[in-house]
Amino acid sequence: MVPTSALPRSPGHPFYAALNKLLAEAKFDAYVEGLCEPLYREGGRPSIPPGVYFRMLFIGYFEGIDSQRGIAWRCSDSLSLRSFLGLKPTESTPDHSSLTIIRQRLPKELIEQVFSFVLTMAFEKKLLKGKSIGVDATTLEANAAMKSIVRREGGGTWKAYLTQLAKEAGIEDPTDDQLRQFDRKRKGKKTSNDDWQSPSDPDARITKMKDGTTGFAYKAEHAVDLDTEIVVAADVKPADQADGETVKDTVVDAQGNLNDATKQECRITEVVADKGYHKTETLVWLGDRGIRTYVAPRRDTRKRRWDDKPEGWQEAHRENQRRTGRDKGKQLQRKRAERVERSFAHVCTTGGARRTWVRGIVEVSKRYLVTVMAHNLGVILRTLIGVGKPREWASMRGFLATCAALWLAILADLVAAGHRVAELASDFADQLLRPRWHFSTSPEAASSTAC
């Protein structure tokens, strides 16, 4: 028998303590428990509180862990994270299989409601304006391998397809090495999404990845408030859908999330995007809804024809081109390139969302949306306490320690030179405004002072 007083305890990480305080002020746990209550039944084994489930996924973002197994192991290994989850010293942390069961139980609509609740928290902190929206997309690596692709019709494998082509080319009973050489040298090689799919994840699409390779992926699209860097909409779509078409759904989702978060009519007035989103039909669609577009135009190799296009298309195209050429349009494009890309860097690169370990577009969307929630919470905390991730807290503490050491070193040198304490502060403040260290002292003191 070991008394609980003898068990190891942790004072908790200051960053996670600040995050818990923010969630407690907004009554986050009570809100998500009210939403999830109809999905749980009375009796049976005690379930994991919804607040603990969301906190564990938040930890995946803040610690840069992409898999649920890694999150479960990290939570069980760290006393400070156990304190963040609100677990007693004698309680065990949830298993990764429990996270899977809860994710499958919660519908996507419920996750979207929690996402809107986090936007409400940002609005109450005056971090949500929703006037100028930047839109961009990136690819997410799916949990599917190219070597296992099969035909959409018939389910034939890639090896069987190559064997048939090799026999037609005159190679009887080809070996695996001969098939690889034949596949490497043959002309007109294509792998179309219309013909091939992954047997383990049919929703994934074949596309070109960020590193130049070809693989199965999804497309994640962000709509970011360019004034505050809050992500107001994030959804996962098939990777083969064009940006000019998916932006419509993203703008509609962003408008609905803003209305739900602010509890009032909050109209988007400007949409900024790169040239991948330049489609005249989309420009007209946005203009009909009172939204000014700042979409970078594509470089046309030949003169465009407008006599076969509907009325208003040419005017929408030219108005967008004029707006992007002005100083305001260039400034908004710089903001988009900086802040929207930064959201992808935080969520996908350092947040662990670039590689997904779940399958199906709905499950991937739910998992990704929770990661974007954590990103928005990090933006709020960066405004309140100056840091948005635990790593930033450690680097800031090191910076403050360096400044304090520099302060003490300067004070020690000046006191040793015989200066009064009152002159110390004024001299040091004066030196901050100069490009070099220079002390106006007597020749005797100057000779004995080295700085």
Regions found by a protein language model. Give the residues of each.
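A short, ordered amphipathic alpha-helix with a cationic face
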Residues: 5, 44-47, 87-89, 344
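Generic start-of-chain signal for non-secretory N-termini
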Residues: 1-9
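Basic, short loop/linker segments at the boundary and entry of helix-turn-helix/winged-helix-like folds
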Residues: 9-58, 63
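Short amphipathic alpha-helical interaction patches enriched in hydrophobic/aromatic residues
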Residues: 40, 60-61, 83, 103-106
